[in-house]
Structures are given as C-alpha cells and as structure tokens.
C-alpha cells in the first residue's frame, strides 16, 4: 500500500510537470468568482450593505461599494422598469432572466444577477466583475488562447440567438487575464420576436446539446418570475429556428 501511494504521488507530480493536471475548466476561473458559489453570492447581492453609491455610464446605473470583508466587493444596480426606451423594449427583469438561462446552460458568462431594492426602488443587482478588460483595444488573444476564445464566441452567438438579444457589441463584452469571456447588459433581451439576431457560422456541439435539452418546465421554473408566458415560448421557438440553421451548416 505504501509503495502504491508513493507511485500515485509520483504520477501526480509527473502529470503536473507535464501540464496534464486537472481539466482547464477547474484551473481557469479567473475573474469568475461566482462559479460554484451561485447561491451564496446571489444571497449576498440581495442583502449586503451598500456603503457607497455612485452613478456612472450613459444609462446611469448605480455602482455600489459593499461593506469590506464580504464575498463581493462591488455590484451594479439598474432600476429599469419594463417599458420602451429610445425605441427598444427594456427591463431590469431581462438582466435576471439572462443570468438564469446562463445557469441552466452552465455557461458561466453572465455574472450573478438578482432582484433587489435600493432606496425604495426595485431593480437588478449584478456582481461587478473585477480585474477585467474591454475588447475595443485588444479584441482577440494570442495563438495559445485562440481556439478556446473562438469556442466562447460561438457559445455567445448561440446564447444571444436563444434569448433574442440584438444589442451585442464590444461595449458589453469583457475578458479577464485568462481570456474568459464575460457578457453584460441584457436589458433588451427576450421579448416575443422569434427571428434570430445573429448568423451562426459555427457552433459548440456540447453547448448545443445543452440548449436542445432545455424543457418548458425548466424554463418556467427559472423564468416565470421575470418573463411572460409568450416570452418563454419565444425562447423555444427561437431554438427551433436555431435547429434549422444548424442543420444547414457544413459538416
């Protein structure tokens, strides 16, 4: 037994030296501090004290600094009531719904978002992701990260089509030092339109399998607090159009 134990330790050391340790998904969380801690971070966002608030950006969301020493340092809060703004249907509830769909698909690109009251108003509180960069100055990684990055972009396109999100731009995409993609600003997502916002030139087959496995019961349980019945049905209708388009892609 002792000899076997020593062999096992030696094997672990050799694999680590060769770079064949645990799967990359367990090594490259980077700025995604919420992965595997969804419920506790969601609850913290609902209840943590906001010790300093500042309004920023063109849409004037509120960035809250939370009491030091907690699970999360900052959050962003938007009180966008359901309605039409500048010609677009928007709602803070869509921010939460996008996170819930992300969770169903274990995509881990949309930061935790929950409903919360702040100064008597109800809105969406979302984890403020630290240590990230925008993509406008540096939109693509080096060769070593390129294949994984392209797979992430393919999943993003599939996700946007599923939730009917037409407003994707470099301005609402972030990445951390590990080139993990993080997606923001989904207040214009969902709705009842079933046209696909973006053309899919490639897909992530594993991610498509997750999308295909979604059921109406799963969507109802996760989204009925945030979306109307016809908006939930539109997700399934868009999935059918995705299926048709995917079948036409070259193999």
Predicted regions: what they are:
Residues 20-26:
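Boundary at the C-terminal end of the N-terminal hydrophobic targeting segment
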Residues 43-144, 161, 165:
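Conserved ATP-binding subdomain of kinase catalytic cores across diverse folds
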Residues 1-9:
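Bacterial N-terminal signal peptides that target proteins for export
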Residues 67, 90, 176-251:
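C-terminal catalytic region of ATP-dependent kinase domains
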Residues 8-19:
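Bacterial N-terminal signal peptides
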Residues 169-170:
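Canonical protein kinase catalytic loop motif
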Residues 119-162, 200-206, 210-233, 239-240:
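ATP-dependent phospho-/nucleotidyl transfer catalytic cores
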């Amino acid at each position: 037994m002792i000899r076997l134990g020593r062999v096992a330790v030696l094997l672990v050391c050799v694999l680590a030296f060769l770079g064949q340790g645990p799967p990359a998904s367990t090594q490259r969380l980077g700025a995604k501090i919420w992965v595997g801690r969804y419920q506790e971070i969601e609850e913290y966002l609902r209840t943590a004290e906001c010790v300093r608030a500042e309004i920023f950006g063109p849409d004037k969301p509120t960035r809250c600094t939370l009491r030091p020493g907690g699970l999360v340092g900052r959050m962003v809060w938007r009180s966008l009531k359901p309605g039409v703004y500048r010609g677009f249907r928007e709602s803070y509830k869509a921010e939460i719904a996008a996170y819930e769909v992300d969770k169903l698909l274990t995509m881990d690109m949309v930061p935790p978002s929950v409903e919360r009251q702040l100064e008597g108003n109800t809105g969406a509180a979302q984890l403020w992701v630290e240590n990230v960069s925008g993509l406008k100055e540096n939109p693509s990684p080096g060769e070593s990260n390129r294949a994984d990055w392209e797979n992430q972009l393919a999943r993003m396109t599939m996700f946007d089509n599923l939730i009917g999100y037409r407003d994707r731009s470099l301005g609402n995409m972030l990445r951390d030092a590990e080139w993990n993609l993080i997606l923001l600003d989904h207040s214009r997502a969902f709705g009842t339109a079933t046209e696909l916002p973006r053309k899919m030139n490639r897909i992530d087959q594993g991610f498509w399998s997750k999308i295909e496995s979604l059921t109406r019961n799963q969507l109802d349980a996760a989204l009925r607090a945030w979306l109307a019945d016809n908006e939930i049905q539109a997700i399934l209708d868009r999935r059918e159009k995705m299926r048709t388009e995917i079948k036409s892609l070259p193999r």
